[in-house]
């Protein structure tokens, strides 16, 4: 955002999150500003999480999502394994193919190759984490008898979350996806956890999950092999508070207007938000984790989530 919190402020915030029982904290990854979807820049996630590992105790640290095709596979394998080591095995690797064409042009990587590059990267990076003297001959990446140390603390490797799926308003992201099946096949083949788009409708999520389950069978996996996460930006309104009070916070992140925020993000009082979360979780057929992204570093929103929203979500 326009004012980045200091490491001391971030550490205090996350330690309070630990005290309130939150399980994990994740970072978004963008090399550049990407308006209108996001109207801000982001700290580089691996450097950020390395710093946060030193000022937290138990909370898991991850990305949601890191644009994997922008990285070099061997360098990234070492970089993330180092983070897993420094954090005591607390990392969650959430990855996606990315979408912002300017970022790929800047890195000299053809935008249309990003999906196939990500497939190869997932294969090569996990192989480098699992063993030594790795030989890999892909279209984009080749190594011979390569060993990368250190290995991650978590075995065989940190959990891999993959984000993606159907979504409305492709214009927000500057692209139109005509065939989502390659994305869903990638999720079915490689993901320990699937993270659908926060803006996806219940019907989209249900349709994607049905396809993912069919693709998993093709890869010899069972639906029970994969967990699911619901994620969204959130702003909890206090009793009687108007939605407009959240506008300055949402505008830091998104160039969209208030009706868009109300429809696709979590903006409302506690009971309304709990109902929205329960509905999306039901569309997923249940999920193992809910990731809620407050819009500032104030612990007030954390307290409202822990004290007012999540207990209502958990109600039978």
Label every model-predicted segment:
Residues 1-316:
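Active-site-adjacent structural elements that line small-molecule/cofactor binding pockets in enzymes
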